[in-house]
Structures are given as structure tokens and as C-alpha cells.
UniProtKB/Swiss-Prot annotation:
Gene3D superfamilies (alphabetical): alpha/beta hydrolase
Known partners and oligomeric status: Oligomer composed of disulfide-linked homodimers.
Upper classification of the organism: Eukaryota, Metazoa, Ecdysozoa, Nematoda, Chromadorea
Main enzyme class: hydrolase
Species name: Caenorhabditis elegans
Enzymatic reactions: acetylcholine + H2O = choline + acetate + H(+)
Disulfide bonds: 82-109, 270-286, 430-558
Protein name (database record): Acetylcholinesterase 1
Keywords: Cell membrane, Disulfide bond, Glycoprotein, Hydrolase, Membrane, Neurotransmitter degradation, Secreted, Serine esterase, Signal, Synapse
Any one annotated GO CC term: synaptic cleft
Entry's Gene Ontology molecular function annotations: acetylcholinesterase activity; identical protein binding
InterPro entries per the UniProt record, alphabetical: AB_hydrolase_fold, AChE-related_enzymes, CarbesteraseB, Carboxylesterase_B_AS, Carboxylesterase_B_CS, Cholinesterase
């Protein structure tokens, strides 16, 4: 409820009167009336607590709802960010530092921000969009400049909510006990969702139109909420950008999560414990007593390979009942409206961190010819692919054949692009496709986009293309902030299209349909399992050479990752000498045009009898 009592906020040149709001538990708070970067008014609330601080004996536990307060809360200051590491790899380069937390780091970090267009009016019944940030489950905060919700809120007349959740070991340590149940970051998100469902009507929000949207690990989080029966009552639609619960880095088994705890225990010099029959009580006691900075400084000790984040959601039997692939296959998820998509060059950002010998920082912004030959390309690929692929020559050869550039001459840019597509498909695009396809097959309405525009204000080198995460700038309306950025007119129009599609989806479940019943000029078709139509999101001048509506995207490559390669790994044991003979023959045929690698190999296998052994299998 609102109270007629007014609070006056004194700023250097303004005095703004703000109504006091009482939450449904009676807690009073007030925000501030501000202008968007486009000059339109809104009311902003920052730092509203939705949980008790997870400190002391609450560290690693599920969050507890915030107890009511009686003194009016001044919700005009950005909240703390959750404890996390900082990216210093490229020094003070803005392209990397823009993703670092920009407020004080603290374990006391469970707060949310609310943006309301104009003045707060409980009678408005506006659609609500709840943002979940990404960051690999090890970083991220709701207060980043790129997540500033003012422009999206006022331009599309929606309410925007952005919550913090615990990351890294603080949010995802799994010890199979109430003191560290795992998925604490997911429980944080769910508690924030419950807060929204309970209170957003007081801000003018429509409880029947709550849409979750997130990017990367935030998108994986949103899709995990689609899988969890715990979350289903508290949202209605979902948007996933460049991430999915089926991404190989998004969820891990319990035994892996438990092993990580042992490795961290040893790295922190708490003791020397074996992975066989470890004493988890001692491990948990060490972590509970440890300084937060000590935990943060050692959090990466359990990492094994590229794309392996140290602390992520786990199939705990509580929040998550089964692995994501099983849920999708059996239809055990919330069938609703889903908007999903990915970017053209998803993995290049991560490759540069993982391969410093190939992409040295000293030459990063001046060179483009980092990979000049096949030998160096294969070396880089072997440093990036997961172990279960590398341990079998046949599966490695299959991946190399799928992605090795075929057109001659092969340029350094071709080698980089092939590596990027290989890892981008595996870690991002194909998992988003998998989620979209399953949602469609089980009766949900799905819309798919593919972002292909490299922004004029992009600070990363041109050879990196359309990077992971950089659709966010357009969705939150950054190009419209002309006082700070110098985007082109076409890019401002693209940003308007992004915002309109996203807001329409939140309002009506259809990105084409405006709230007044009219439709957008460009028709975005529903995604289906046959034609797999998607909207190519780019500037208008690109369309003559590029189709507005595509099919896939990356459907052939994703069939390789999601169908062919898993079947190959499951079916083939140690292939031994027949493979080597076949490989020699393939080398001789290298200059011939082979239209279907799989067909030729299958023909060859008909005349061979594979030697079976007790050695490790490709699919093990």
C-alpha cells in the first residue's frame, strides 16, 4: 500500500517528492524520481533487501526471507555486489572492466532494484521484466552500467526488476547437507522472484505478466527455473540469451561438486585430504571459518579444463530433480512462451583468455594473424576441447573434420573463425537451440533470434566479430544514450527493435504483438522443429545481403554436437588400427571433393571388424 506521507530527497539542483510505499508485510520504503538518459521520468528503487544477509552461520545456507522493518528504508543507493573475483587480465581496458562489479563487495548482497515508468501507480498493471545477470556463476551484479534499466523502462512502459544472487563458492558450494545444500544462488533468485510476485503490484506491476530474462549464466538460470517445480508459480514467460540449462558448463553431477570441495580444501591448506572417503564435516568447517577473500582467491583451484566453471548449479534432488537433458526429453518443464537466441561469435571472447600463447596480450590490439597454419590451429583446439573428446582419436578427428576450413587459401581469420564457431556452437548456440526445440516439441510457443551486428561502439578488436554478451547493450537501450555514446541512427533503430520485441513478448507473449493489439511491421515467425525459423537481428542496411528470416541457426553443426557425436562416442570403443588405416586413406583423398564424411566412413566400417578391448571408451 502507498502512504500519503511524502519524503523529500535533496539533490544538488533538485528537490523530489516521493511517495512512501509499504510492502505487504508492512515494511516502508521510498525511492527517487529520476530522468532516463532520454529525458523521460521514472521512479527508481535501489537496494531493497529481499533476504536476511547470508553471513555468519547463514553462509552457504538457503536464503531466509527478510524480516519486516519499521523505519522507512531509503532505497536510493546502489546495493553491495556479492563477493566475486575481478577480471584484470587486460588491465584497465573497458571491454573487460565493464563486466567487473561496480559496487562494494560483500557477503551481505541480497538486494534488488526496481524501475517504474513515471510515478508509481498501483492501478497501472504493467508487465514486469525480471533480469538475471550472467557471469559464469562466478561473477556478476545487478548494478552494472550496461544493465541500467532506465531507458528500457520508460521507452517500453514496463517495470524492470534486477536482483543480486550469490555466486561462486558462496552461491554454489554443494556438500549434501543443510549447511551447504548447493544451488544457494538459485534459491536466492527464487526468493527474489517470490518477493516480486508478492509485492510488485504495489509498484504498478501485473502479477499475471512476469517475465524472466537473462544472458549467459543468467539465461542458464532462467531455463533452470523452467525445469524446477519450485519456480513454476512465480513467473509466466522466459527469455534466454546465449545460455541454457543444457550448456555443458551450466549444471554438474553431485559427485563432481563434492570432489571440487575436497580440491579447494587442499588448495586452501586446511589439510591434505584424499578424494576417497573425505571428511566433509572438516571441509565444511574450514570453509565456514575461512575469510571470504581467502575463499575467493582459491575458488578456481578445482577447474579442470576450458569452459569448466568452478561452482555451478547441481542436480540436488530438491531444486533440480534430474539432469536437464532428461527433463527436456520427457517434457518435465514449464511449457509457456519462450524467446531464445544467441550471437554470431559466442566463444571468441573466452578463447583469448584461454590461449595466451596464441593471443598474447601485448599484440592483442595490433595483430590479426594469430593463427597462420593448421598445426597451430589443432594445438589450440586440443587445449580447448573437453577430455572425453580428446581421449579418442576418432571423435577428435570428427570434430576437426566438421570445423576445419575447406576453402583455399585458408587465412588466419578463417582459422580463428573456425575455432570460435567450434567452441561457440558447443558451449552456447547448440544448447540454446536444444532448449528452444524441446520447448516447441512439447507444445510451448517459441521465438528465436540470431544477433549478427557488430556495434560501431564495440571496444574489442574488429577481428573478434559479434561477441558474447553484446546484445545486452541494445536490449537495455544503450544506443539511445546519445550524451555518452555515439551509435549510428541505424543502431538506435536496432535498439528500439530489440526493446520493442522484448517488451511485447513480456506484455503479450508474442514479440510481434503490441499491447494495444496492433502488430510490428516486421513479422517474426514462431520457431518450429521443421523449418526452425529465426529472426536475424541486425541493422536494416545489412538485410539486402542477409536474410531477415533464417533457418537454424547452425542447424547442421548442432546436429553434429547434439546427435551424431554423442552417438559416435557411445557406440565406438577403442577403434585401434582400422581407424589409423582409414585415416591414412583419408589423407590420400584430401584433395578430392568428399561431400559426406560420415557416409564414407560408414562405408569403410562395413568391411572392418573393430577390435574390442577393456580400455577406456570414447564415451566414458
Amino acid at each position: 500500500m502507498r502512504n500519503s506521507l511524502l519524503f523529500f530527497i535533496f539533490l544538488p539542483s533538485t528537490i523530489l517528492a516521493v511517495d512512501l510505499i509499504h510492502l505487504h508485510d508492512g515494511s516502508p520504503l521510498f525511492g527517487e524520481e529520476v530522468l532516463s538518459q532520454t529525458g523521460k521520468p521514472l521512479t527508481r528503487f535501489q537496494g531493497i533487501p529481499f533476504a536476511e544477509p547470508p553471513v555468519g552461520n547463514l553462509r552457504f545456507k538457503k536464503p531466509k526471507p527478510k524480516q519486516p522493518w519499521r523505519i522507512p528504508l531509503n532505497a536510493t543507493t546502489p546495493p553491495n555486489s556479492c563477493i566475486q573475483s575481478e577480471d584484470t587480465y587486460f588491465g584497465d581496458f573497458y571491454g573487460s572492466t565493464m563486466w567487473n562489479a561496480n559496487t562494494k563487495l560483500s557477503e551481505d548482497c541480497l538486494y534488488l532494484n526496481v524501475y517504474v515508468p513515471g510515478k508509481v501507480d498501483p492501478n497501472k498493471k504493467l508487465a514486469v521484466m525480471v533480469w538475471v545477470y550472467g557471469g559464469g556463476f562466478w561473477s556478476g551484479t545487478a548494478t552494472l552500467d550496461v544493465y541500467d534499466g532506465r531507458i528500457l523502462t520508460v521507452e517500453e512502459n514496463v517495470i524492470l526488476v534486477a536482483m543480486n544472487y550469490r555466486v561462486s563458492i558462496f552461491g554454489f558450494l554443494y556438500m549434501n547437507r543443510p549447511e551447504a545444500p548447493g544451488n544457494m544462488g538459485m534459491w536466492d533468485q527464487l526468493l527474489a522472484m517470490k518477493w516480486v510476485h508478492k509485492n510488485i503490484d504495489l509498484f504498478g506491476g501485473d502479477l499475471s505478466r512476469i517475465t524472466l530474462f537473462g544472458e549467459s549464466a543468467g539465461a542458464a538460470s532462467v531455463s533452470i527455473h523452467m525445469l524446477s517445480p519450485k519456480s513454476a508459480p512465480y513467473f509466466h514467460r522466459a527469455i534466454i540469451q546465449s545460455g541454457s540449462a543444457t550448456s555443458p558448463w551450466a549444471i554438474e553431477p553431485r559427485d563432481v561438486a563434492l570432489a571440487r570441495a575436497v580440491i579447494l580444501y587442499n588448495a586452501m591448506k586446511c589439510g591434505n585430504m584424499s578424494l576417497i572417503n573425505p571428511d566433509y564435516d572438516r571441509i565444511l568447517d574450514c570453509f565456514q571459518r575461512a575469510d571470504a577473500d581467502a575463499l575467493r582467491e582459491n575458488e578456481w583451484a578445482p577447474v579442470r579444463e576450458f569452459g569448466d566453471f568452478p561452482w555451478v548449479p547441481v542436480v540436488d534432488g530438491d531444486f533440480l530433480l534430474e539432469n536437464a537433458q532428461t527433463s527436456l526429453k520427457q517434457g518435465n518443464f514449464k511449457k509457456t512462451q519462450l524467446l531464445a537466441g544467441s550471437n554470431r561469435d559466442e566463444s571468441i571472447y573466452f578463447l583469448t583468455y584461454q590461449l595466451p600463447d596464441i593471443f598474447p596480450v601485448a599484440d592483442f590490439f595490433t595483430k590479426t594473424d594469430f593463427i597462420k597454419d593448421r598445426q597451430l590451429w589443432i594445438k589450440g583446439v586440443k587445449d580447448l576441447l573437453p577430455r572425453q573428446i580428446l581421449k579418442c582419436q576418432l571423435t577428435l578427428a570428427a570434430v576437426l573434420h566438421e570445423y576445419e576450413p575447406q576453402d583455399l587459401p585458408v587465412t588466419p581469420r578463417d582459422w580463428i573463425n573456425a575455432m570460435d564457431k567450434m567452441l561457440g556452437d558447443y558451449h552456447f548456440t547448440c544448447s540454446v537451440n536444444e532448449m528452444a526445440l524441446a520447448h516447441t516439441k512439447h507444445g510451448g510457443d517459441t521465438y528465436y533470434y540470431y544477433f549478427t551486428h557488430r556495434a560501431s561502439q564495440q571496444t574489442w578488436p574488429e577481428w573478434m566479430g559479434v561477441l558474447h554478451g553484446y546484445e545486452i547493450n541494445f536490449i537495455f537501450g544503450e544506443p539511445l544514450n546519445q550524451k555518452r555514446f555515439n551509435y549510428t541512427d541505424e543502431e538506435r533503430e536496432l535498439s528500439n527493435r530489440f526493446m520493442r520485441y522484448w517488451a511485447n513478448f513480456a506484455k503479450t507473449g508474442d514479440p510481434n504483438k503490441n499491447e494495444d493489439g496492433s502488430f510490428t511491421q516486421d513479422v517474426w515467425p514462431k520457431y518450429n522443429s521443421v523449418s526452425m525459423e529465426y529472426m536475424n537481428m541486425t541493422v536494416e542496411s545489412s538485410y539486402p545481403s542477409m536474410k531477415r528470416i533464417g533457418h537454424g541457426p547452425r542447424r547442421k553443426e548442432c546436429a553434429f554436437w547434439k546427435a551424431y557425436l554423442p552417438n559416435l562416442m557411445a557406440a565406438v570403443a577403442d577403434v585401434g588400427d582400422p581407424y589409423l588405416v582409414w585415416k591414412q586413406q583419408m589423407d590420400k583423398w584430401q584433395n578430392e571433393y568428399i561431400t559426406d564424411w560420415q557416409y564414407h566412413f560408414e562405408q569403410y566400417k562395413r568391411y572392418q571388424t573393430y577390435r574390442q578391448s577393456d580400455s577406456e571408451t570414447c564415451g566414458g
